[in-house]
Regions:
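Acidic helix/loop microenvironments that form the catalytic cleft of cell-wall polysaccharide enzymes
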Residues: 113, 195, 225-226
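N-terminal targeting leaders characterized by basic, low-complexity, disordered sequences
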Residues: 1-12
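N-terminal capping segments
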Residues: 10-16, 23-26, 45-170
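Hydrophobic membrane-insertion alpha-helices, especially the h-region
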Residues: 29-47
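...with weaker cross-activation on analogous glycine-rich loops/strands in unrelated enzymes
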Residues: 140-221
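Post-transit mature regions of eukaryotic precursor proteins
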Residues: 1, 24, 30-31
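A structural signal for short, hydrophobic beta-strand segments that form beta-sheets
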Residues: 132, 207, 238-241
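Low-complexity, Gly/Ser/Thr/Pro-rich intrinsically disordered linker/tail segments
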Residues: 215-251
Length: 251
């Protein structure tokens, strides 16, 4: 039923300022802006968190000798590789992922240049194992079983062993592949770990003991950005692969 009009609202005349409706505050808009800012800050700041944490948890070069001495007395299969990685962490190496033509076997880029995969290759060479030669031989015999990510038609001795995806496949095929976990007790010195970074890029490093006071913790030696580091970041990224490899010695 339609509401009946009253004479009251028709006959009384209001004299004064015209009433103004009070504007309702748009609280939703403010929350949307805050939420967007938070998402942007999280997304772009997330890659920085491990680096900031690593700055607080990295070890000094002076502590390397103590841990290396302990590893030399160890009977662990990966002790020699872990020692080589710790010694490598003292080197001044600029990050450079460029393609270079190098010799074969035992070829290498300039000693003051390198990237993540070079840490693995150079440290294994200190134990008498040349991954450049081993990866090439395996790719030559089983090329289609390796990642087809670079539009290559054949193996390339200049770069194949310097690609993390190829090293990962080599260790899967020729080493011991362990189930990735977030339990420190599952990792031993000399283990190889492959991570997936926030950018989805693959990264690789070598597990080593921590410095005095943290020797019970699995730390890593790796080359992520501007320098080679020995630091406590094993679980800062998503672990994609965990391997042990103690291959044949080079003749």
């Amino acid at each position: 039923m339609a509401r009946k009009k009253t004479i009251f609202y028709e006959t009384i005349e209001y004299i004064g300022p015209r009433p103004q409706l009070q504007k309702r505050r748009n609280r939703l808009g403010g929350w949307v802006i805050v939420s967007i800012a938070a998402v942007i800050g999280f997304w772009f700041g997330r890659p920085l968190v491990p680096s900031l944490r690593a700055t607080q948890q990295s070890a000094s070069v002076g502590q390397v000798g103590q841990v290396v001495s302990a590893l030399e007395k160890s009977a662990l299969p990966g002790a020699q590789l872990a020692s080589a990685a710790l010694e490598y962490s003292k080197r001044d190496v600029a990050y450079d992922a460029s393609y270079y033509k190098i010799g074969f076997p035992m070829g290498d880029v300039a000693a003051d240049k390198g990237m993540a995969a070079d840490v693995i290759v150079r440290c294994f060479r200190e134990t008498g194992i040349d991954l450049q030669e081993l990866v090439h031989n395996d790719m030559k015999a089983h090329f289609n079983r390796y990642p087809q990510l670079w539009n290559a038609a054949r193996p390339d001795t200049h770069i194949d062993h310097r690609r993390v995806a190829n090293l990962q496949r080599f260790f899967e095929r020729n080493g011991e592949a362990l189930k990735p976990s977030r339990h420190a007790m599952d990792y031993a010195p000399g283990d190889i770990v492959v991570w997936s970074l926030a950018s989805a890029e693959k990264h690789i490093g070598i597990v080593v003991p921590g410095p005095e006071g943290s020797s019970h913790q699995p730390w890593v030696v790796h080359h992520l950005d501007d320098e080679v580091r020995w630091e406590n970041v094993l679980f800062d990224f998503r672990i994609e692969g965990h391997y042990r490899y103690h291959g044949k010695k080079i003749d």
